[in-house]
Amino acid sequence: MGTSNWQNISYNIELVRKLDPDSILDVGVGFGRWGILFREFLEIWDNGRYDGNWQRVIDGIEIFPGYIKDYHRYFYNEIFLENALDHLQNSEKKYDLIHFGDVIEHFTKVDGTRLIELALQKGKYVLINIPIGRYWAQDGTEDNPFEEHKSVWYNNDFTKFRYHKIKTFY
């Protein structure tokens, strides 16, 4: 299972707490880091409730079923096991926040751009975490070919979108 840098965690959680979304779509669930952290710091942190009767919707998309374990079902309301681009093209559901945690680079540049455009249509806010630059090449694995990085992204790739804020972590 792929994993991601930790340097951006507190920054992301602070942003999401300020946005205070009632509904989140976590694209690329993987280990479940972001869904768990969003659940903790949007619901448990302030009221200490662990009963699973959540007030917010946190859904996820994961293309590789082998990543989804029993614990995911506690933190996520629903997990869609499909390609994120297909899901966003076919779903009518809208979210306050659509989050991409190291996902966009697993698509071609054309498909990744389309994915962002769809998210901007279906989300009030879109938060993207992505490795920047050419030093993040990654092949798929024998178990999961979807781990392959199919595109390289730079900060200026995101400036074409109407509203954007870019923060780089090293």
Which residue ranges define each predicted feature?
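S-adenosyl-L-methionine-dependent methyltransferase catalytic module, highlighting the catalytic core
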Residues: 2-7, 33, 85-89, 100, ...
